[in-house]
Amino acid sequence: MGYDFKSVEKKWQDKWEETGVFHAVDFSEKPKFYGLVEFPYPSGAGMHVGHIKAYSGLEVVSRKRRMQGYNVLFPIGFDAYGLPTENYAIKTGIHPRKVTDMNIERFSSQLKKVGFSFDWTRVIDTTQEDYYKWTQWIFLKMFEHGLAFRDKTLVNYCPSCKVVLSNEDSQGGKCDICHSDIVQKSKDVWYLRITKYADKLLEGLDEVDYLPNIKLQQRNWIGKSTGAFVDFDVKGSDNEKLKIYTTRPDTLFGVTFMVMAPEHPMIDKYADRIANMDAITEYRKECAKKTEFERTQLVKDKTGVKIDGLSGINPVNGKEIPIYISDYVMMGYGTGAIMAVPAHDTRDYEFAKKFGIDIIEVIKGGDISKEAYTGEGECVNSGFLDGIKNKKEAIEKMADYLSENGIGEKGVQYKMKDWAFNRQRYWGEPIPIVYCPHCGMVPVPYDELPLKLPKVENFEPGSDGESPLAKIESFVNCKCPKCGADAKRETDTMPQWAGSSWYFLRYIDPHNDKAFADKDKLKYWGEVDWYNGGMEHVTRHMIYSRFWHKFLYDIGEVPYDEPYAKRTAQGLILGPDGDKMSKSKGNVVDPNDVVDEYGADVLRTYVLFMGDYEKAAPWSKSSVKGCKRFIDRVWALQDILTEGDEYSKELESAFHKTIKKVSEDIEGMKFNTAIAALMTLLNDIYNKGSINNAELKTFVTLLNPFAPHVTEEIWATQNYGGMLANGHWVDYDEAKCVDDEIEIVTQINGKVRAKLMIPAEIEAAEAIELAKKDPAIAAAIEGKNVVKELYVKGRLVNIVVK
């Protein structure tokens, strides 16, 4: 009988939904398992095979854990606010609400068609009022605790999307959404003070089970550095000091100039004392046209203007040094000014060479007439540091000197900056703040949340860069919640990252209208046991969500400090040509096409069999067909089925070994080798020519997490009772996983001459005698003097002859 996957798969998907077999149960006495995958952004393109691979890993783990007796929470939802939907809506004229609803319906249908065991009663959508009410609530809590604030600053602005972007969303000088060049623009911006949590975010990494590369990326992203703040007197000012931060205070004697950011406020303050203010003004105009990426490129030509009228005084030797402005120094980084040690910094060296500035060696080891020396060495030309060869010792000694003399102090800086948290677009969570002429910024009262996104027809961004909400008088004009006076609402919306910063908490209690989640349920489900997703999200999204969670923990809203106990990641699925899939290359594989042609079980099995789960692998249609043949052969096992409620003698060891292998490999995310073990066992079964009921039950149980439809159908066809989805995982006997016989090699003078099978627990002398009786070995040593005999257990016999 042939296997009709189309009718079988639909049948079981309907049955799983009808019975609610995948519904998580709050407060169950079973051990709990919370498995989390990154909820998708429901784009118009629909799901791609990368989504299938991303979800299939924990899908397999979750199905196995259910059969092991766990109460499993494996939820799904939709991260649906953001620019892609809004840009599509503007392009097509279809309202973003309608676009979002259509896309979510399509994604849901696709996910169900693949047979994922999600709990569909807990679905969340970040654009629904009952969800973003709590996003706004958390924002107001941050505002209340001083973590949400507004400041005027230069921002990364995308002229195409007409939106302000965070540094993280504009890396490489390009908009993360449309890939246009970004520009710098002065604007009032909402920030979240994530830097206040920098140390907590770093320390928390020691307590979690993340892949080493994920921890490394997060540490690098936060970018903690230790050094010193140093005060330089500014000659020409009213006794002002220019504060800088350096990780190398031991090189202070080598400072020969300073550089300010073109936007530094000291320039405007003393404009009337600066002789070349016209040249500086022109240079500042040029800088304003450049992106942050363009300004900080290491390989670009060095530009700058010397400030005539202000100069610095080196605090350790009293020397007067020039101050320049240059575009590579940014106001948003450090203090907006740097000290320059050209002998030992490549960028400073190039700048000094171009502008004819002194270069003084303070660390021996290089030839500074040719290039900066950036290595370690003995301190020279450095007063009280001369002769010190240990960098750490020199840094400590200088830091102490700065402190003792009141000219500096030890300090810490972070590469990570406070999070720009507003967008001038329609499709996002409204920021619940009111501007009152008398009271200033006033939060919308908690009991008035959600502040609803108004339903409008014109949602296009303004040419002035203001939010579309600014045009809606009925939304903007309001009364101050504090004094009742006429007031204006904030018209910017939150970035797409807002809703995804706490979604894992809402899954725990998605229908609660009194709190974002019940505290007893939060205690029961605890932190996410296992989170899997893409490597592209291990910095921004994960750091943002860890920050939100730690804040909620600090104010007593969640009972545990870290949101995710474990984090893993899957590799990309590449196109058949080995390149990254993209529409422009025409190498995109639609999962719907695979399901329609081969079935969901084949797709599920293939994406996990195609290679190491954590690494990228190209799509191969021939391998897909191989998985189809595998599923068909599994179905055909029923044709060679015999009676029997115990493993046959011939297959007993193979079954126990496979149970162990598959069980361990699923937990280790070695899905490809787990499937390979099942394929090997299948071959063993066919070589034997028959399979009994005990063996078939075990085989389909092991395969079920990977291919649930065909295995459920076999289980039901054979009247084994119940459903595999809530069946029992199989155990193995460790003693029966050990081979009775093993294959070893026999060497003569180190060269392999024969292979033979011997008992696994044989004594050395007996193993050597058996080896010598092998015809090939006997012939090779005949007439020769045996000098030495060695048995390496389980591996080889080596005979040395002369």
Region locations from a protein language model:
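Conserved oxyanion/phosphate-binding beta-strand-loop segments in alpha/beta enzyme cores
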Residues: 1-36, 66-75, 99-106, 283-324, ...
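Residue patterns forming the tRNA-binding/recognition surfaces of aminoacyl-tRNA synthetases
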Residues: 2, 11, 15-19, 91-242, ...
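NTP-handling and nucleic-acid-processing catalytic cores
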Residues: 3-13, 49, 135-359, 364, ...
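N-terminal catalytic cores of NTP/NDP-binding nucleotidyl/phosphoryl-transfer enzymes
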Residues: 25-94, 100, 123-138, 246-247, ...
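Glycine- and acidic
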Residues: 38-47, 119-124, 330-338, 380-384, ...
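Secondary-structure transition/capping motifs at alpha-helix termini
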Residues: 63-71, 91-97, 113-117, 144-150, ...
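Helix-rich, typically C-terminal accessory recognition domains appended to large enzymatic cores
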Residues: 79, 144-160, 251, 410-439, ...
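Alpha-helical recognition segments enriched in aromatics with Gly/Pro capping
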Residues: 310-333, 362, 476-615
